[in-house]
Amino acid sequence: MLKVGGKGAISSLKAKTVFPLAATIEEIMRTIEGGKNVNELLAGMKRREGVSDEVEVSGEDTEFTKIKIGEFYSSKAVLFDVFIQLNSGKYIKILHAGDTFDQQRIDKYKNDKKIEYLWFKKTDRAKYLKYQAHLTTKIISSEKVPIEMKARFLKNVTSKYVEEVMSEGLKPQIIEQGKQICEQVFQLVDKEKNLAKLLRGYQEFDPTSVDHSYLVTLFTTSIIKQFEWQSQATIETASMACMFHDIGKMKMPERLLEVRPGDMSAEDLELYQNHPVLGAEMVDGNNLINNSVKQIIIQHHEYFDGTGFPFKKKGAKILTLANIIALVDDFVHIMVERKMKPTDALKFILMDPLKVARYNTIIVENFIKIFVEPEKMKIIIPTQ
């Protein structure tokens, strides 16, 4: 029977839901076992019954990427080598590619040794993404899986996807995989009745990871959903732009990547404020990325009052989708850096007229709507 590697991921749910949910996920995983997507990943892999011995290995930390141990899911045959980290440069390979997946070995490290993360080679990230994206599609379409779990699956696949883009660039197969994730985002925001509850209580963010792009995607598409002109194509276009919006930072000096704009010198700030232009240049000429995505990337820091960058566009000269992302980008930074709940970060923005002036009023109004039902709305938007 296929084992499920994610008990820890559902521990925050009420106890009575744990076992039915685990069974539901196991059932979903069983339906994709032996399917085309999994078989393609297993092609050419030497498979073994049972589990190989654990092996201590050395390697550069930059060669590895991590995932929370409670959120690791595997096919019956392990698709790639899986490690735990002993210390910098030292790892133990606890699962070997081709082995039969062993949940007990995972549980030993999670429960007995309190290990929080599993690691795998960045060269195997594409395999992880392909399997995880296929599984996420099934999870999101299931009526039995709660929205919190759906969002967790989507977060993991989006975060690792952005890592892959930043590492490997905009290769055709990577862009196509991004389109699949955009479809998943649409399905989540379009079908879920409990989306407002999820957004109000969302606290699963890590300021040291690429979760930023996922959070921007989730909140941006939720705002777009409030507009009468919203459509699947619009939401998927915005999702792609959200995942790529900071791609221009790949061309910035590495020393600036961990520095906030407020702490930069005038010279470094000028370099930073050019990253939307660099991002647009990177996707320019790529026929797999439509022009709307390119325009959003170059405008995602433009403000409605003309105080943004790189071109200080103002008012109607800014694309609505770009101004939405500008708002959400600011909101996510406030939420994460100040460790605020989403609703508190919203209030922080609304209490500052200078901040509110950066965004089209209708965007701010629709931002409020994603947290509360219109008839319950009591927040007054400051006048611009």
Predicted feature locations:
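Non-catalytic interface/linker regions that flank or bridge core catalytic/transmembrane domains
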Residues: 1-203, 207-208, 384
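Acidic-histidine catalytic/liganding microenvironments
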Residues: 13, 112, 227, 286, ...
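Acidic/His-rich, divalent-metal-binding segments that scaffold phosphate/diphosphate chemistry
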Residues: 137-273, 280-285, 291-292
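Histidine/acidic-rich helix-loop-helix segments that form or flank divalent-metal centers
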Residues: 238-242, 270, 283-325, 340, ...
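Short acidic, Gly/Ser-rich segments with clustered Asp/Glu that frequently serve as metal-coordination loops
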Residues: 248, 332-333
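Active-site-flanking alpha-helical
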Residues: 252-253, 306, 336
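Phosphate/pyrophosphate-binding active-site loops
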Residues: 267-268, 278-279, 333, 345-348
